């Protein structure tokens, strides 16, 4: 068994990381841009979200298809259980967030854009649903900061404190 994830899994992991940064930055920094740029910034956010959704589903399918490389030295069962729980939360979060965002945008009942394309929208707006979905989307996005921070801290703890190969399994291979 390989001691690293596949190149595809590693590439998708880091691409999702970059897309999450872009999606978060689009929303956090949009106030620094003129209002006339908001549609473009929103389109970037939505396009990143759709890309994250697709890539997270692909990651999940790859994770089911390929065995997870072993952590060496093997951690205690409780640590393994916590890692599985953490990964479950990450997958659920970064699949649910884009789905909620897409359903929210659809229910606004007006044109919206992703990848430069006009996306389908409801013939009649449902603002009550939009408000509820927006609240969930924002709450989960804020939770995402904590989950990402915890994920990164755990990877660094594995590398520097427990001195195992957890972090190295997801790092790109060195060129020969």
Curated annotation (Swiss-Prot):
Amino acids binding heme b 2? 45, 137
Tell me what induces its expression.
Expression is 10-20-fold higher in the logarithmic phase than in the stationary phase and this pattern is not influenced by the presence or absence of oxygen.
InterPro entries from the xrefs?
Cyt_b561_bac/Ni-Hgenase, Cytochrome_b561_oxidase, Di-haem_cyt_TM
Q: How is its activity regulated?
A: Quinone binding to the enzyme accelerates the reaction with superoxide.
> Transmembrane stretches, by residue range?
8-29, 40-64, 78-103, 136-158
What biological processes does GO assign it?
A: removal of superoxide radicals; respiratory electron transport chain
For the keyword Membrane, the answer is yes
Q: Which Gene Ontology cellular component terms are annotated?
A: plasma membrane
Task: Enumerate the Cytoplasmic topological stretches.
Answer: 1-7, 65-77, 159-176
User: Which SUPFAM superfamilies does this UniProt record tie to the protein?
Assistant: Transmembrane di-heme cytochromes (SSF81342)
Protein residues bound to heme b 1:
13, 151
> How is it placed in the membrane, per its record?
Multi-pass membrane protein
Pfam family name, one: Ni_hydr_CYTB
Q: What class of enzyme is it?
A: oxidoreductase
MF-aspect GO terms:
electron transfer activity; heme binding; metal ion binding; oxidoreductase activity
Subcellular localization, per the record? Cell inner membrane
Q: Which cofactor does it need?
A: heme b
What PANTHER family does the record tag this protein with?
CYTOCHROME B561, SUPEROXIDE OXIDASE CYBB
Q: Which NCBIfam families match?
A: PRK11513.1
Subunit composition and interactions = Monomer.
Q: Which family does it belong to?
A: Belongs to the cytochrome b561 family.
Supply any other comment. The low-temperature difference spectrum of cytochrome b561 shows an alpha-absorption peak at 561 nm and a minor peak at 555 nm.
Q: What does this protein do?
A: B-type di-heme cytochrome. Catalyzes the oxidation of superoxide to molecular oxygen and transfers the extracted electrons to ubiquinone through the two hemes. Can also use menaquinone. The enzyme may be responsible for the detoxification of the superoxide anion produced in the membrane or at its surface. However, it can also efficiently catalyze the formation of superoxide from ubiquinol under physiological conditions.
In Swiss-Prot or TrEMBL terms, this protein is called: Superoxide oxidase CybB
Designated gene of the protein: cybB
């Amino acid at each position: 068994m390989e001691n690293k994830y596949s190149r595809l899994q590693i590439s998708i992991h880091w691409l999702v990381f970059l897309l999450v940064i872009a999606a978060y930055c689009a929303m956090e920094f949009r106030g620094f841009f003129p209002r006339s740029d908001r549609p473009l910034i929103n389109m970037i956010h939505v396009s990143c979200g759709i890309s994250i959704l697709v890539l997270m589903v692909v990651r999940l399918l790859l994770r089911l298809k390929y065995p997870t490389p072993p952590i060496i030295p093997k951690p205690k069962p409780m640590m393994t259980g916590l890692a599985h729980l953490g990964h479950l939360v990450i997958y659920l979060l970064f699949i649910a967030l884009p789905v909620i965002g897409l359903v929210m945008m659809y229910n606004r009942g007006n044109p919206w854009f992703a990848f430069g394309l006009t996306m389908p929208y409801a013939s009649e707006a449902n603002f009550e649903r939009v408000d509820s979905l927006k609240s969930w989307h924002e709450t989960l996005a804020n939770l995402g900061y904590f989950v990402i921070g915890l994920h990164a801290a755990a990877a660094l703890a594995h590398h520097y404190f427990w001195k195992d190969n957890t972090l190295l399994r997801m790092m790109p291979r060195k060129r020969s």
